[in-house]
């Protein structure tokens, strides 16, 4: 055990000793009832499952979320999480057991995992008293006898146990101890570094009947796509807690950076927001059947907080800047023959917060990867007939750097999962999600988000009910 962990455990021993006197077990033990939530089943019900975590601070990052709004976080997490994890350690994570009932009052459906440094039965009784449904037991701080003793108490209270391991030795112990849920911590507890490849190395060694969770260091949807074949779910905390827009961060993590373009009516804007799409595209090219003028655009996006992208084609610079400013666009997307001079001049007159995206034919992208435009934040890669709703052969992008590329052209429910295998920054959907030009089809949008969430194609024709999970 390293010095940091030793310090934490010594402090935890003192915490337990103090709280046993402050809040003796006999004062609340007869008020404890067995949990009626099933943490294990929540992880099995959908693949991948997500344990979304509430965490104010950590030893490695310090303060992560200074204004921890438990009610706001709970309202968001209850839409997307399979289970909710709450850090209750006070000194190092600025947590509290009293966080649990606040979250439980709002998130009625999700089991709650209490994450702490469990070393004493008292902590387990306390966790259940405050309505936790599962606990984390770390093999890095417990010997086998201690682990079994604590697990038996948890199971007596009908609480599940997430057994955390950090290395192969601990994994062997977890298997021998017949752990039902194993969490692979991608963090090195000696130096606090992160390596998500650890999940790929250790997961294949675990029997299939055991549920595997990947913990720590998960940054984005592409990483989840890579790790999903190895695990049942993910525990994600720090990367979400540090974001100003939590719901957007959750949607990006679970569904990816997706844009639905060609929006022409407010009902569609509200729908794509509700189902976790991050970017909404507004087309200001007059030749497009999905053309919308500035005033109409303003009225349909009013009070719906998406990141809006304005699409322009060889438009007057001042008009692009005017519309971008009036609508507070996230980015302007140039879809014509705009050259470097045009882009430079546009950059000078655009508000600093508005990004520039440039559509480019995939053949041109392949030829000029090292000599693309300056002052462009993202590239929309399309086929040679951009905007036609047709795909191109994606194998040409296989060895390209795609972290600033948004794939477009004929994307739909049937090919979206194959597209996400490429690892692009994001994906641009339009005509294939419509019932007619500019009119989006609700069932297709729901089926798309189902598919992206589960990483498998979902047939919208079989859609019976709507929902986010």
UniProtKB/Swiss-Prot annotation:
Signal peptide: none
EC number in record: 4.1.1.48, 5.3.1.24
Region (Indole-3-glycerol phosphate synthase): 1-257
Gene Ontology annotations of biological process type: L-tryptophan biosynthetic process
Keyword Ligase: no
Gene Ontology molecular-function annotations: indole-3-glycerol-phosphate synthase activity; phosphoribosylanthranilate isomerase activity
Chain segments carrying region N-(5'-phosphoribosyl)anthranilate isomerase: 258-469
Family annotation (InterPro entries): Aldolase_TIM (IPR013785), Indole-3-glycerol_P_synth (IPR045186), Indole-3-glycerol_P_synth_dom (IPR013798), Indole-3-GlycerolPSynthase_CS (IPR001468), PRAI_dom (IPR001240), RibuloseP-bd_barrel (IPR011060)
Keyword terms of this UniProt record: Amino-acid biosynthesis, Aromatic amino acid biosynthesis, Decarboxylase, Isomerase, Lyase, Multifunctional enzyme, Tryptophan biosynthesis
Family recorded in the similarity comment: In the N-terminal section; belongs to the TrpC family.
Record protein name field: Tryptophan biosynthesis protein TrpCF
Organism: Buchnera aphidicola subsp. Baizongia pistaciae (strain Bp)
């Amino acid at each position: 055990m390293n010095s940091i962990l030793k310090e934490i455990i010594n402090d935890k021993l003192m915490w337990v000793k103090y709280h046993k006197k402050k809040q003796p077990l006999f004062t609340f033990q007869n008020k404890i009832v067995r949990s009626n939530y099933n943490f294990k089943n929540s992880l099995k019900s959908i693949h991948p499952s997500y344990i979304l975590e509430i965490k104010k601070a950590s030893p490695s990052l310090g303060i992560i979320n200074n204004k921890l709004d438990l009610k706001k976080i709970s309202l968001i997490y209850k839409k997307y999480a399979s289970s909710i994890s709450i850090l209750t350690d006070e000194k190092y994570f600025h947590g509290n057991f009293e966080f649990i009932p606040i979250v439980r009052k709002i998130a009625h459906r999700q089991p709650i995992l209490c994450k702490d440094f469990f070393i004493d039965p008292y902590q387990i009784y306390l966790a259940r008293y405050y309505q936790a449904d599962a606990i984390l037991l770390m093999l890095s701080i417990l010997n086998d006898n201690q682990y079994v003793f604590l697990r038996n108490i948890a199971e007596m209270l009908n609480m599940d146990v997430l057994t955390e391991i950090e290395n192969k030795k601990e994994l062997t112990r977890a298997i021998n101890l017949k752990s039902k849920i194993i969490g692979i911590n991608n963090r090195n507890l000696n130096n606090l570094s992160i390596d998500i490849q650890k999940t790929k190395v250790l997961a294949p060694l675990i029997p299939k009947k055991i549920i595997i969770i990947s913990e720590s260091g998960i940054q984005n949807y592409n990483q989840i796509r890579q790790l999903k074949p190895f695990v049942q779910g993910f525990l994600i905390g720090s990367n979400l807690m540090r974001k100003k827009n939590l719901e957007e961060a959750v949607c990006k993590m679970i569904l990816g950076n997706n844009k639905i373009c060609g929006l022409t009516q407010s009902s569609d804007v509200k729908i794509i927001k509700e189902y976790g799409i991050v970017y909404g595209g507004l087309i200001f090219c007059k030749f497009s059947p999905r053309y919308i003028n500035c005033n109409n655009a303003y009225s349909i996006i009013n009070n719906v907080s998406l990141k809006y992208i304005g699409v322009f084609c060889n438009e007057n610079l001042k008009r692009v800047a005017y519309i971008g400013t009036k609508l507070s666009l996230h980015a302007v997307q140039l879809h014509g023959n705009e050259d470097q001079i045009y882009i430079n001049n546009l950059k000078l007159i655009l508000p600093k917060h508005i990004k520039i995206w440039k559509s480019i034919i995939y053949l041109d992208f392949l030829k000029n990867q090292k000599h693309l435009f300056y002052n462009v934040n993202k590239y929309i890669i399309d086929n040679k007939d951009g905007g036609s709703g047709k795909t191109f052969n994606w194998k040409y992008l296989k060895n390209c750097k795609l972290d600033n590329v948004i794939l477009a052209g004929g994307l739909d429910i049937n090919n979206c999962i194959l597209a996400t295998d490429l690892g692009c920054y994001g994906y641009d959907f339009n005509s294939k999600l419509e019932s007619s030009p500019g009119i989006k089809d609700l069932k297709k949008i729901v089926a798309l988000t189902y598919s992206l969430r589960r990483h498998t194609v979902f047939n919208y024709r079989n859609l019976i009910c709507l929902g986010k999970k």
